[in-house]
Amino acid sequence: MAAQIPESDQIKQFKEFLGTYNKLTETCFLDCVKDFTTREVKPEEVTCSEHCLQKYLKMTQRISVRFQEYHIQQNEALAAKAGLLGQPR
């Protein structure tokens, strides 16, 4: 059975998600939408927005992978250090 996440943590995660979503939306909108003379979204604006989102997702994934690699290295270093400290001389 999966552990339940406390409600306060769920709220915090949701607020962080909304903050990230809002920032991404604003960034891509400001970069991609330039013409307000029509109610329709132009194809180049759609393409730009899609590329902006894809770039952000790839960046987020890459940072996550690098963070995991760094965390693993730190854990291995701590384990090695603990192993050395635990051995008699």
Curated annotation (Swiss-Prot):
Entry annotated with the keyword Ligase: no
Bridged cysteine pairs (disulfide): 28-52, 32-48
Stated role: Mitochondrial intermembrane chaperone that participates in the import and insertion of multi-pass transmembrane proteins into the mitochondrial inner membrane. May also be required for the transfer of beta-barrel precursors from the TOM complex to the sorting and assembly machinery (SAM complex) of the outer membrane. Acts as a chaperone-like protein that protects the hydrophobic precursors from aggregation and guide them through the mitochondrial intermembrane space.
Keywords in alphabetical order: Acetylation, Chaperone, Disulfide bond, Membrane, Metal-binding, Mitochondrion, Mitochondrion inner membrane, Protein transport, Translocation, Transport, Zinc
One CC-aspect GO term: mitochondrial intermembrane space protein transporter complex
Pfam families reported in the protein's UniProt record: zf-Tim10_DDP
Signal peptide (residue range): none
Record's subcellular location: Mitochondrion inner membrane
This protein's record includes keyword Protease: no
InterPro entries, A to Z: Mito_inner_translocase_sub (IPR050673), Tim10-like (IPR004217), Tim10-like_dom_sf (IPR035427)
MF annotations from Gene Ontology: membrane insertase activity; metal ion binding; protein homodimerization activity; protein-folding chaperone binding
Membrane topology, record value: Peripheral membrane protein
Domain of life: Eukaryota
Oligomeric and partner information: Heterohexamer; composed of 3 copies of TIMM9 and 3 copies of TIMM10/TIM10A, named soluble 70 kDa complex. The complex forms a 6-bladed alpha-propeller structure and associates with the TIMM22 component of the TIM22 complex. Interacts with multi-pass transmembrane proteins in transit. Also forms a complex composed of TIMM9, TIMM10/TIM10A and FXC1/TIM10B.
Record note on domains: The twin CX3C motif contains 4 conserved Cys residues that form 2 disulfide bonds in the mitochondrial intermembrane space. However, during the transit of TIMM9 from cytoplasm into mitochondrion, the Cys residues probably coordinate zinc, thereby preventing folding and allowing its transfer across mitochondrial outer membrane.
Residue numbers carrying N-acetylalanine: 2
Name of this protein: Mitochondrial import inner membrane translocase subunit Tim9
Family as reported in the entry's similarity comment: Belongs to the small Tim family.
PANTHER family linked to this entry: MITOCHONDRIAL IMPORT INNER MEMBRANE TRANSLOCASE SUBUNIT TIM9B
Taxon lineage: Eukaryota, Metazoa, Chordata, Craniata, Vertebrata
GO BP of this protein: protein insertion into mitochondrial inner membrane
Segments carrying motif Twin CX3C motif: 28-52
